[in-house]
Amino acid sequence: SIEQGAGVRAISGDKTGFAYSDEIMMPALLQASSAARAIARHGNEGTLQAWHASGDNTLYPALDPLERMTAAEKVALLQQLDTEARAQDARVREVIVSLAGVHEIMLVAVSDGTLAADVRPLVRCNVTVIAEQDGRREQASSGGGGRSDYGFFLEEDRARGYAREAVRQALVNLEAVAAPAGSMPVVLGPGWPGILLHEAIGHGLRS
């Protein structure tokens, strides 16, 4: 299953055992725990402390983005971004807009008694634009996201900003000229420039 599951890690000395289960049911969890313990067994028995909740450390709201915007509202937002991008310049030929959201709930139980949960929303919006001029086609993308719901893209006109930025970059690419190529002198100072030289040609020469 790619929607739910549990992982177990057992550590004993320098040995570590891993096991997982696609089912969040007690028999499956006990079986995974036994498998991980058998892998890491080192001749000693560990003890399990009484569970206690970890302190509250909220970094972002525990929202479910999948339920906070209807399908019709999502389609309307995508259409707005398509319209915004095409309105920027007549050279825009194609607009590809995507909207994605994830809602994960994690529970971590440690043998020292720590019991911690994390509700993790994640949203992403991306706009790709293809522009054409005199038979030349160029494309560019812009987007953003964060651990919030889809309302994040409506704040401060963020989503429309992605569309405008994608168009701007595509138009810059239309006017871009090829970088000079061929042999040319390169002067490098001591220290970090050697790293640049290594990364630029060293790996290729080594292979």
What positions do the PLM features span?
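Active-site bordering "gate/hinge" segments
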Residues: 1-207
